[in-house]
């Protein structure tokens, strides 16, 4: 789950991390009220969307008067912002962040991720702030300094000081950075984060460190124990199909192909997608219905798949372990009738009562094709969508 910048900064502030003064606004009047409460004569207006690249897309503006602020707020709110990280439709701008400006002397980068290789939280810092860290890692990896955090003791002060020295910080800045980095490490673990970025972390001309921008991703598997963070979720920034799938505990990821996939088991789903590509097709989604492939869940999964206008055919690949394949076949046919699926559906059943399930599918008068193997299923669905 992603947070907006203003939500990330609220979280930063609660852990003692320095952020610019500012507030979120949902209309022009709110924006003007926020500006009147700030001490600077110029303000930064930022569109709040779950996407990077806002500056280049016109989602970050510097304004010098109340009239200019009102005009910018009016032009942003209620629109959709298209950046290199969004699709062609863009993301809806329902809120803006109005902040004080600051005099920037230097820009740094500070972030944290869960590193699969070390199975630890790794904090990364760089002198190349304001630039995508992926670009820095590709072009000048020597400018990224990494700190592996021991899960038993957390971030240690000596690690913070060593990193501060590498960043070229001096005197009081080292003390500020130590406080900031330790707060970041504690927040990362306390809040079950999967990604945290402060880019840029700026040094002002008065020598103060400020988190000028913030990005936070929360581990969706841990939301059950993060009720306050869960309430910050903005579903308007998410894919409708993914939201519906989440409500039914279905694992759904949209892709760019034309063949919808419904499979029970993540590994089997990935193998199914591979076989589709092997035979010349392109999967339109990853969808794992899990172990409980009931009629209701199958029906909802089909609704989600057919709501994608790109889908020209559906491949259902179910392994009947505890659940009998004949019951799954009945559920698939009932779901096809309920959803009124017009496109071809190829079903491959394997396991408990698989033969009986295939007979049930073959005897139906619906546009449902039974396959004898995964290879056979892939060939049949690719042929069906090619007609």
Curated annotation (Swiss-Prot):
Residues reported to bind Mg(2+): 199, 213
One of the record's GO cellular component terms: cytosol
Pathway(s): Carbohydrate metabolism; tricarboxylic acid cycle; succinate from succinyl-CoA (ligase route): step 1/1
Every ATP-grasp domain range: 9-244
Transmembrane annotation, as ranges: none
Keyword ATP-binding: yes
Gene3D superfamilies registered for this protein in UniProt: ATP-grasp fold, A domain, ATP-grasp fold, B domain, Succinyl-CoA synthetase domains
Catalytic reaction annotation: succinate + ATP + CoA = succinyl-CoA + ADP + phosphate; GTP + succinate + CoA = succinyl-CoA + GDP + phosphate
HAMAP family: Succ_CoA_beta (MF_00558)
Assembly description: Heterotetramer of two alpha and two beta subunits.
Family, per entry: Belongs to the succinate/malate CoA ligase beta subunit family.
Protein name from the UniProt record: Succinate--CoA ligase [ADP-forming] subunit beta
Source organism of the structure: Legionella pneumophila (strain Paris)
Gene: sucC
